[in-house]
Amino acid sequence: WTASFQNLGFQADGVTIEFPWVGDKLVEWDKDSKEVIWTWNTFDHFSMLDYDQFGGTWTEAYLSLQYDWTHVNAVIFDESESAIYISTRHLSRITKIDYPSGEIIWNLGHEMPSGQVQMGNEIGFSFQHSLQKLNNGNILTFDNGNLSPEFRGTEQPISRAIEIEINNNNAALFWSYDLSPDLFSFASGNAQKLENGNVLITTVGGGGRSLEINPQGELVWEGLYNLSLPDGAVYRAHRIPGLYPAAYSVLINNLEGENVNNGVFLPEGSSNISFSIVNEGSYRLPLLLQIADEEGWFGAQTLEVTLEPNSTQYVSFNGNIASANNTSLIQLSVE
């Protein structure tokens, strides 16, 4: 591309910065005041000696006259470590950042002129998407493999899901699954470790599809999206427990009567009213229950409960009934 840029009047000498380089900035806002309380800028921590030389990013720069230098596409925060992990696509790099100091703990990926990458060059991932920190401490990512011929010696670009084990300053490939060449994902895609131990892989290749792969590398499920590029590109897919995280029912126990005469008959003096809360969703469901009534039999009581998926919990409120001959409208609020 040197001649192309020189024909446009640029020096293109490999040293002179002649048009904007676009980096990335992480920003943390206070959720209440909306004030910026922390930032991290790639220009402050990455060397501009490092840039993509093989993946075609300069083609876009030639057309737009600005260079998409870093292209961070995934950020995760590990609260237990107080660390941030980022995936920088155009540097084929994964970085672990100390929070809040902002200091780089390590860079993992393709070796570049600055020498800032300490490990993982032999893994050979490139133009990756998505990050997941696993319970065993490993990192799962989707290696798009745009540069797998250059980095891994493959005959053509191969996409794969890879799990990387990191010990001190050493990184090694712990598990991987290569997609067939026709499922190569030049962009987008992701990998998700499921609760059953399998990995869900999503690619734009082959019309877009998701594949569930077990630890032995066997295909156990496949979903085809039949999408056409570029408008139909699927960016990522995640398996979730269900579509309705807050689906529940409240049943009044010992309800008697019909229509407008429905009610619970309570004896005079100390008594209680009970309800059955049914979690009809696929998520753990925390609820706050509040009861109140016109006569003040139950006062103002609150109760916090957490229901497991597809479970029922019995709750009861104690009260003091002044007269069994009176009626009182009882209201139970659930939120």
Regions found by a protein language model. Give the residues of each.
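Histidine-/acidic-rich catalytic cores in large beta-rich domains
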Residues: 1-293, 317-330
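Short proline/glycine- and polar residue-rich coil/turn motifs
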Residues: 304-313
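Enriched for extracellular/lumenal, surface-exposed ectodomains of secreted and cell-surface proteins
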Residues: 332-335
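Surface-exposed, proline-enriched loop/turn segments that connect beta strands in immunoglobulin-like
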Residues: 260-261, 300-303
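Short, solvent-exposed loop/linker segments at beta-strand-coil boundaries, enriched for Pro/Gly
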Residues: 293-299
